[in-house]
A protein has these predicted regions:
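C-terminal auxiliary extensions adjacent to catalytic cores
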Residues: 3-50, 54-61, 65-73, 99, ...
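Short secondary-structure transition/capping motifs
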Residues: 54, 58, 91, 95, ...
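Conserved SET/PR-domain catalytic core that frames the SAM/AdoMet-binding pocket
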Residues: 76-78
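FAD-binding core of FAD-dependent oxidoreductases
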Residues: 80-105, 109-134, 160-183, 193, ...
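Acidic, glycine-rich active-site loops and adjacent beta-strand->loop/helix elements
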Residues: 86, 112-113, 132-133, 153, ...
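FAD-binding glycine-rich core of flavoenzymes that anchor FAD
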Residues: 137-166
Length: 536
C-alpha cells in the first residue's frame, strides 16, 4: 500500500498539479471526478499503487451543492438527517444546542457491522467510491469530507470495516464504521497493523474529522461498501470465467470434441454465441488435437458456445452495472438545481440483480464443467478408458473424485438462489424495501471459491486424459496441460489428490496465470473491459 503522506495529495490543489506531483513521487494517479471508474482504475486504487486525485471542477460542484444545502437550512426548512432524526426518528428535531452532538453521534449509532473485516483493497475501494459519488455534486456534504476520504487513501490508511449489517439500501451499518473511524472512533489499518483509529491517524499525520451537518449522513448513508464488494467480486468472476473457458476447452479437446457445433454457432447463434463459437473454433484448432470419430457430441461439448456465451454476457453485464454505480449518487436527501429533494436512489436493485444473474449463469457453467468431467472419466469415449486407467495399470483412477465435482456444482447451484426478494420492513414501516446486495455478493464470492476448485479438477482430468491417450496439446489446451503438470505428475498409481487440486486451483486463479491463459486465446473486448491483461 502506498505510504504517501496526506499533504502531498490532499485533493485541494489543481488537478493537473496533483497528477504531476504523483508522477514525480514515482506513482500514477487516478482522478476522481464523479464519473464511472473502470476496472483498471479500480484495481490500481484498491492496490494503492496509484494516488487518488480530486478533480477541481468536481470539487467546485460539491461546494455549490453545499451552499444550496446550507441555504435550505438557513431558511428554516426541515431537512432529513441534518436537522431531523433518521429512520423511525424522522419526526424528531434536535435542539440547536444539541445539533452538533446529534451529527457527531449519528455515525456511532450506525457503526454496528460484525464479522471478519473486509480486506484492505476492498475497503480502499469503498473509500474511493464514496468520494467519487460525492464528487458528482449532489450530496450536500462539505468538500472537506471528500478531501478527507482521499487523504486516507493516499496515506495508506483504511478503517476496519466489518461486513455483516446491511440490507442493501445504503450500507449504513458498514459505512457507519467508516464515519466513526474518520472521527477517531473505532479501528484502522496502517502498514498492515490494526490500531485504534486515533493512533493510526496520528501516525499518518491526520487529525480526527469533525462532521458538519449532513457530513455524518453522507459518510454512512451510501452503498459504497456494497459497490466495492461488487466490483471486486465481479472482477474476480471475470478471471474465473476465463479460467473455466480454458479448462473447458482443454477438456473438450481431450474428449475429441467435433468442430461442427462451434462453426454452427458462428452463423446461427446470437452475436455473443457467434463470438464464442469463433473463439472455440480457433482455440480448438490451435490445440492440434484431432477430433473424435463419431456422429454426434454429448450436449456438454456440443452446447459449449451457448453456455459460455451466457456466462460471458452475464458477467460483463454485471461489470457494466457495477462500473456505472461507482459514480451514481445514492444519497438521501440530494441537491438538484439548488433544491434539496428526497430520493430513493439508495436501492441498488439493478446491481443486485446483475450480481445474482452472474451467479446463476456461472452455476450453468459449473454444471457444464461437471458434466465434461463425468463424460471423460466414464470410459465411453474412444481412446479414453474407464476412470482414465490405462490398460495393464493397477489403479482405481479418477472415478471417485467425480463426487467432488458433484458437490462443487451443488454448492454453486445453492449459492445461485436469489436473496434480493426477501421481504423485510424496519424503521417503523418507513424502510420496507431491500436488496441484500452485500449478501448477494457474498454468495457470488463463495460460488467463485467452488468454481476455482472445479476448474482445477477439470484441468487435472483433462491433463490425465491427454496423457493416457498419448496426446501433446498445443495452444490454450497446452497451457492448461502445462499448468497442471508443473504441480502434479502424471498418474501412474493412485495417490491423494486433495493438495494437488488445491494447488492447481490456486495457480489457475492467480492473476499471472489468468492473464497467460487469456493471452493464449484472447476474448479481446471482454478482456480489455475487465483489464485482464493488467493482471500479468
Amino acid at each position: 500500500v502506498s505510504e504517501l503522506s496526506p499533504p502531498e495529495f490532499p485533493g485541494g490543489t489543481s488537478t493537473g498539479l496533483a497528477v504531476l506531483e504523483a508522477v514525480a513521487a514515482g506513482v500514477g494517479a487516478v482522478v476522481l471526478d464523479g464519473k464511472p471508474l473502470g476496472f483498471s482504475a479500480l484495481r490500481r486504487l484498491s492496490a494503492g499503487v496509484d494516488a487518488a486525485v480530486i478533480d477541481e471542477t468536481a470539487l467546485a460542484a460539491v461546494a455549490a451543492a453545499r451552499t444550496a444545502f446550507e441555504e435550505a437550512l438557513a431558511s428554516g426548512a426541515l431537512v432529513y438527517g441534518a436537522n431531523t432524526g433518521v429512520g423511525a426518528m424522522k419526526d424528531w428535531t434536535p435542539s440547536p444546542e444539541d445539533l452538533a452532538r446529534f451529527n457527531a453521534d449519528l455515525v456511532l449509532a450506525h457503526a454496528f457491522g460484525v464479522g471478519t473485516p473486509l480486506s484492505v483493497p476492498v475497503t480502499r475501494l469503498a473509500l474511493a467510491i464514496r468520494a467519487n459519488t460525492m464528487l458528482a455534486g449532489h450530496t450536500g456534504s462539505t468538500p472537506d469530507l471528500a478531501r478527507r476520504l482521499v487523504a486516507w487513501l493516499n496515506a495508506g490508511l483504511t478503517p476496519v470495516l466489518r461486513p455483516v449489517g446491511s440490507l442493501g439500501t445504503a450500507d449504513i451499518g458498514l459505512m457507519g464504521q467508516v464515519g466513526a473511524a474518520l472521527a477517531g472512533d473505532g479501528e484502522a489499518m496502517l502498514a498492515g497493523e490494526t490500531l485504534p483509529a486515533l493512533e493510526a491517524m496520528s501516525r499518518a499525520g491526520l487529525q480526527p474529522f469533525e462532521c458538519g451537518v449532513k457530513d455524518s449522513l453522507a459518510a454512512l448513508s451510501s452503498n459504497a461498501a456494497g459497490v466495492a464488494l461488487s466490483t471486486a467480486a465481479i472482477g474476480r468472476a471475470a478471471g474465473t470465467l476465463r479460467t473455466l473457458m480454458a479448462t473447458g476447452l482443454a477438456a473438450a479437446a481431450a474428449a475429441g470434441s467435433l468442430p461442427a457445433p462451434a462453426l454452427a454457432a458462428t452463423v446461427l447463434g446470437t452475436p455473443r454465441q457467434a463470438e464464442i463459437g469463433r473463439w472455440i473454433d480457433t482455440a480448438r484448432t490451435d490445440s492440434a488435437v484431432p477430433p473424435g470419430h463419431r456422429l454426434h457430441d454429448p450436449l456438454s461439448l456440443r452446447m459449449m458456445p451457448q453456455v459460455f456465451a451466457a456466462a460471458v454476457d452475464a458477467v460483463e453485464a454485471a461489470g457494466r452495472v457495477a462500473v456505472a454505480d461507482t459514480a451514481r449518487n445514492d444519497d438521501n436527501p440530494v441537491v438538484l438545481g439548488g433544491a434539496v429533494l428526497s430520493s430513493g436512489g439508495s436501492l441498488p436493485l439493478d446491481l443486485t440483480l446483475a450480481v445474482e444473474g452472474a451467479t446463476l449463469a456461472l452455476a450453468h457453467l459449473a454444471r457444464n464443467a461437471m458434466n465434461r468431467c463425468i463424460l471423460i472419466v466414464n470410459g465411453r469415449l474412444v481412446g479414453l478408458p474407464v476412470n482414465l486407467v490405462a490398460p495393464g495399470t493397477t489403479m482405481t483412477g479418477f472415478g471417485p473424485v467425480l463426487k467432488l465435482a458433484g458437490e462443487l456444482f451443488a454448492r454453486v447451484r445453492h449459492l445461485a438462489v436469489p436473496v434480493s426478494t426477501e421481504p423485510l420492513t424496519v424503521a417503523d414501516g418507513m424502510e420496507d424495501e431491500a436488496t441484500f446486495l452485500p449478501l448477494a455478493v457474498d454468495n457470488l464470492s463463495r460460488a467463485l471459491d467452488a468454481l476455482d476448485l472445479l476448474a482445477a479438477l477439470e484441468a487435472l482430468i483433462a491433463a490425465a486424459a491427454f496423457d493416457v491417450a498419448g496426446l501433446k496439446p498445443n495452444g490454450l489446451a497446452g497451457c492448461v496441460h502445462a499448468a497442471v503438470r508443473r504441480l502434479a505428475e502424471p498418474h501412474q498409481r493412485d495417490r491423494r489428490l486433495s493438495l494437488e487440486i488445491e494447488a492447481i486451483a490456486a495457480d489457475l486463479a492467480s492473476p499471472e496465470r489468468i492473464a497467460e491463459l487469456a493471452k493464449a486465446a484472447p476474448l479481446t473486448d471482454f478482456d480489455n473491459f475487465f483489464a485482464i491483461f493488467d493482471l500479468a
